[in-house]
Amino acid sequence: MLGVEALRNERSRLRQEIADLRSAICKKEQSLRELEEALANGGGNGDGLADEGGERNTGTIQTQLTNDDIARYSRQLILPNFGVQGQLRLKNSSVLIVGMGGLGCPAAQYLAAAGVGYLGLIDYDQVERSNFHRQTLHTEARCGMAKTESARIALLELNPSCRIHCHSELINSHNASNIMRSYDVVLDCSDNVATRYLLNDACVIFRKPLVSGSALKMDGQLTVYNYGAQGPCYRCIYPVPPPPEAVTNCGDGGVLGAVTGVIGSLQALETIKIIVGGLGEVLAGRMLIFDGTTGQFRNIRIRSKRSNCHACSSQPLITDLIDYELFCGMHATDKDHPLQLLESDQRLDVQTYHDKLESQPHLLFDVRSTAEFEICQLSTNAINLPLAEVLDDSYLKRFAVELQNKDLPIIVLCRRGNDSQIAVQHMRNRFPDHSIRDLIGGLHAWTRKVDPDFPIY
């Protein structure tokens, strides 16, 4: 009989095989649809589909709705100022969604459902379980699949007539021009500052509206950049990037899935208004702020174009894409990147801790938040000491007795091994004669190297 680990491996293999087969079927079905469309249009290359490089070829403009279109979109066709012409504009439009996460999934879902003719999906990442509470296009069966492919499967089940191209890569200064130039509207559904500056500059250069959304914890924001004569770009509002230590993504700060659903849906709404026209005032020069704790929306006016903006002024300094990771001093992904703040003798490998120190007398401080500490603890001896209490020195009184013993080793841990280094730095400044070390890689490393059954989040 197979052991537990072998059974888990076989389960993972079967899930991946099923996901690969579904992806292959999806691609074959789309290829069949494209061939049928080409035959219906008399053959040739005027089908408006993506070429090998991912660019959308300009092709035949659709001038009438099919019976299926009328049945499918009837509820929006009867809207004032929408009608047949509005639906045709959607049918002939192309939209690029950057990031198939909590914002990109609802945005893509509503744009595909509304009848946008061509969707481009960009994401470098794969589906994992931590996505499901907010990234509603992905499923358990598609764990490990590229997010773009997973989203395409779901979107084509929703609307088989939508043409979709997957860019399963990280957008950067080298590929952005080739990808973005052929789309009508771009949605920023990313989760990092470097990508926001990249998309902004590219949209200014190629004269594309940029529908920008963000969500963190219980709050969300939405605006449209680079739209209209006086509509500002992202650099008009934020000419200088924030310091890296001031930036928090949803992986670190958390987010409620329903909040991303609200903002992503509103991104789809603004995109439809831009494409159709006449449906109301586009959210350019204004920012919508959503507070999920109160359910309140605020609509505030933001500054107009900055006359000396480096990107969108009459004499811009930025006429080509630059190295945005260098410019922002941070990575262009929402993945956690390990800090290196401590010397090697101030750090401890999780395996070494498990083998040599775990059973010995020591203080084990867990500097995660109280909410995170409630999720899981490394041991019953772990003491929750949130990082904020370390930085404001309030822990000194709380642990005055324990800290008097210089011979008692102090081990500090966190989720991924970054906050623990910050805490150790601060504590060693206070107690230079104490043995204070952090656990390299935190709880994630513990799961990888010591106990694969320990919960990871």
UniProtKB/Swiss-Prot annotation:
The protein's name: Adenylyltransferase and sulfurtransferase MOCS3
Residues binding ATP, per UniProt = G102, D123, S130, N131, F132, H133, R134, K147, D191, N192
Q: Which domain of life does this protein belong to?
A: Eukaryota
Active site residues per record: C250, C414
Which cofactor is recorded for it? Answer: Zn(2+)
Q: Where in the cell is it found?
A: Cytoplasm, Cytosol
Q: Where is this region: Disordered?
A: 40-60
Instruction: Provide this UniProt record's keywords sorted from A to Z.
Output: ATP-binding, Cytoplasm, Metal-binding, Molybdenum cofactor biosynthesis, Multifunctional enzyme, Nucleotide-binding, Nucleotidyltransferase, Phosphoprotein, Transferase, tRNA processing, Zinc
Annotated GO biological processes are: Mo-molybdopterin cofactor biosynthetic process; protein urmylation; tRNA wobble position uridine thiolation
Q: Which InterPro entries match?
A: MOCS3/Uba4 (IPR028885), Rhodanese-like_dom (IPR001763), Rhodanese-like_dom_sf (IPR036873), ThiF/MoeB/HesA (IPR045886), ThiF_NAD_FAD-bd (IPR000594), Ubiquitin-activating_enz (IPR035985)
Phosphothreonine: residues carrying this PTM? T63
Protein function: Plays a central role in 2-thiolation of mcm(5)S(2)U at tRNA wobble positions of cytosolic tRNA(Lys), tRNA(Glu) and tRNA(Gln). Also essential during biosynthesis of the molybdenum cofactor. Acts by mediating the C-terminal thiocarboxylation of sulfur carriers URM1 and MOCS2A. Its N-terminus first activates URM1 and MOCS2A as acyl-adenylates (-COAMP), then the persulfide sulfur on the catalytic cysteine is transferred to URM1 and MOCS2A to form thiocarboxylation (-COSH) of their C-terminus.
